A protein has these predicted regions:
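Positively charged n-region of N-terminal signal peptides that target proteins for export
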Residues: 1-4, 18-20
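Sec-dependent N-terminal signal peptides
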Residues: 4-15
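Short glycine/proline- and aromatic-enriched beta-strand/turn motifs that initiate or cap beta-hairpins
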Residues: 19-56, 233-237
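Outer-membrane beta-barrel channels and translocator barrels
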Residues: 20, 62-66, 118-122, 187-189, ...
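Outer-membrane beta-barrel "beta-signal"
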Residues: 22, 186-188, 220-237
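Residues on the lipid-exposed face of transmembrane beta-strands in outer-membrane beta-barrel proteins
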Residues: 25-29, 53-61, 73-75, 109-115, ...
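Extracellular/periplasm-exposed beta-strand and loop segments of Gram-negative cell-envelope proteins
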Residues: 33-50, 78-107, 136-179, 199-227
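Acidic/histidine-enriched, beta-strand-rich ligand/metal-binding domains
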Residues: 67-70, 74-80, 104-106, 116-122, ...
Length: 237
């Protein structure tokens, strides 16, 4: 067993030394979606989209015959907004109009297995799949309410990570997704895009399952993301 372990380490070291390595920067568009799935309907309820930007560093290593790995460190920002809309509550006479503004900030560490195939000199198409660890920094909504004649108004801000603010719907800061995608590379320039599926329930389970959905443990949330990135490799071995 010891010999096998040593051989595996030596083999990985040799492959890494022979790999075609790139280090670069990337930026692009990200659209994150919070979803609530129920087993009864089979559909996503209350999806909320956040449009934003992604920027970060990427390491790309082609190890053998087009197969390799990419790793990155990204910062992602997203925001959404609603138009003024009517609401039906006991306060309707005082504040019948509401709107909201939301935003989130997070750090991401993607690790993807990748296959590149060369279609022309120093020109490749690529396919990739792999997990991403997301760590939330800020996730908040701000609500605005006003009367029809705009004489009365107030604002209210909620921290979606706070149990005090969100009661039964507080979110976890850590999330894991699994992504699939494709891309194109010409010399040092590349374009990559894909979709990340949330693997864990982002809602704090003891509140979300036991309080809001008691007796239905299969009801869960998801935090997904569309993304497309442009980049340039600044260093190549």
């Amino acid at each position: 067993m010891k010999r096998i372990s040593i051989l595996a380490v030596v083999l990985m070291t040799v492959l890494t030394l022979q790999a075609q390595d790139y280090i670069g920067v990337q930026f692009g568009y990200a659209r994150s979606l919070t979803r609530l799935n129920t087993p009864e309907s089979g559909k996503s309820l209350n999806p909320t989209g956040y449009n934003g930007l992604k920027v970060g560093f990427v390491y790309d290593a082609t190890i053998v015959k087009g197969f390799g790995v990419t790793m990155g460190l990204n910062y992602t920002f997203g925001a959404n907004a609603t138009d003024w809309m009517k609401k039906a509550t006991i306060q309707q006479g005082l504040y019948p109009q509401i709107r909201s503004r939301g935003q989130y900030h997070q750090v991401e560490i993607p690790v993807d297995w990748q296959y590149k195939f060369e279609i022309a000199k120093r020109t490749w198409l690529m396919l990739y799949t792999g997990p991403t660890l997301q760590c939330g920094l800020i996730f908040k909504d701000k609500w605005y309410a006003r009367s029809d004649n705009k004489s009365n108004a107030f604002t209210h801000e909620e921290n979606l990570y706070s149990e005090e603010d969100m009661e039964d719907y507080a979110l976890k800061r850590l999330n894991v997704t699994w992504g699939i995608g494709a891309g194109f590379q010409y010399e040092r320039y590349f374009l990559r895009g894909g979709y990340d599926f949330g693997l864990i329930n982002p809602y704090k389970a003891y509140q979300f399952t036991e309080v809001v959905n008691d007796g239905n443990p299969r009801t869960r949330g998801r935090f997904d993301q569309w993304q497309i990135k442009l980049g340039i490799y600044l260093w190549e071995k």
